[in-house]
Structures are given as C-alpha cells and as structure tokens.
C-alpha cells in the first residue's frame, strides 16, 4: 500500500504517505524486524518472539510457543509463504503458518556457521543469503543445506549489522557492517563440501 512501517523499543508505527497520517500499534515492544505477510497482516519480530499483526484491527497474535523468548534479528517471507527467521543465538527457524510447523537449523544439526543470524536477503535462483556472526552463509532451498564464506575462505573481516542489507536490481547481495557495505555478486561460488564414510581400524578410550 506504499506505507512506511517503523519499530523500536516502545511501539510500532505505520506512516500513510497518501494521508500523511501516523497510526500507532501499541501492544508490543522492542520491535526488531517487520515484514508483510499479506494485504491485511504483518509479521513483527521482537526481542522476545514473533507476532502476527492484523493491521486493520490492530490485534496481535503470538506465533508459536517454540519462539517464546527468542530474540529475532531478521525476517524474510519467501514466495511460497515460508517465513525464514534469523535469530540472535538460536540459528535459522523456518515457519510454515499453514500447519504451524517449525524447522530449526543451528550449528549442531547443520553446516550453519553461526547461530547468530543478522540479516536474511530474498531468495535468488534457489539460494537465500544470510549474514552471520562468523561470515556469510548461503542456504540452498531445495537441498536444505548451507554453504559458508568466512575469513578462512577469504572473506574480509566484518561485523555485520542486524537487519541491514538489500538485494540489488542486478541480483547482487549487499550486507551492512560496522565498516561499511559488503557486496556479494550473484554468481559468487561458495566453498563446496565433500563427505565420505569413515572406517575405523582401531579405537581406544583412555
């Protein structure tokens, strides 16, 4: 609708550019991320979980006990309706509202390089790029696995900012950091991993 949404520590606001009016949506605090769900609803990420806002009535619905107390840094809703949630310590959570299901990726159950996800950018060619505490990670949607680009693979040292990034018209990815913007070209090649079966010829526990 061409509105501008603004969050913060104390309240949520919507600026209507056609009427120059501002509407307050009291009820949540410490808003960290705002994403449109559909024409009537907005996803609101906060320092204590996820909410679904009815923009007409102003009512909030808490989204799932699995996210209770989770600090959310970034939100991205894909074209298929899946909501990708970047958290500050709990990895990446994929939420499917139709059946209220959650899929959680973190360092112990995937190749994700860090559990602190700062920014999630829109999907391009089946890949979703994210900035993390330890570098940039690329999630392959179909295969459901991560490839990482860290200082060990040549990434310049950077401390990324939460919810700071954009997808350019040329499909390159831009992430904001404390040292400026870092642009990643669309055709960047991430290090690939090779896995093989290990065979032990001896095993000793002391």
Predicted regions and their residues:
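Carboxylate-rich, polar loop motifs that coordinate divalent cations or form catalytic acidic clusters
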Residues: 1-206
């Amino acid at each position: 609708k061409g509105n501008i949404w603004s969050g913060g520590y104390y309240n949520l606001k919507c600026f209507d550019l056609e009427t120059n009016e501002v509407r307050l949506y009291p009820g949540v605090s410490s808003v960290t991320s705002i994403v449109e769900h559909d024409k009537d609803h907005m996803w609101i990420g906060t320092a204590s979980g996820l909410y679904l806002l009815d923009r007409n009535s102003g009512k909030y619905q808490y989204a799932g006990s699995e996210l209770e107390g989770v600090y959310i840094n970034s939100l991205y809703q894909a074209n298929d309706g899946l909501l990708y949630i970047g958290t500050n310590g709990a990895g990446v959570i994929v939420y499917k509202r139709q059946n209220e299901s959650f899929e959680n990726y973190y360092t112990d159950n995937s190749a994700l390089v860090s559990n602190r996800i700062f920014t999630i950018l829109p999907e391009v060619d089946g890949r979703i790029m994210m900035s993390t505490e330890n570098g940039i990670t690329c999630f392959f949607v179909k295969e459901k696995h991560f490839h990482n680009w860290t200082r060990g693979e040549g990434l310049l040292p950077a401390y990324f900012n939460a919810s700071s990034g954009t997808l350019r018209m040329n499909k390159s990815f831009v992430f904001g950091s404390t040292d400026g913007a870092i642009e990643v070209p669309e055709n960047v090649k991430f290090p690939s991993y090779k896995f093989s079966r290990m065979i032990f010829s001896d095993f000793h526990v002391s």
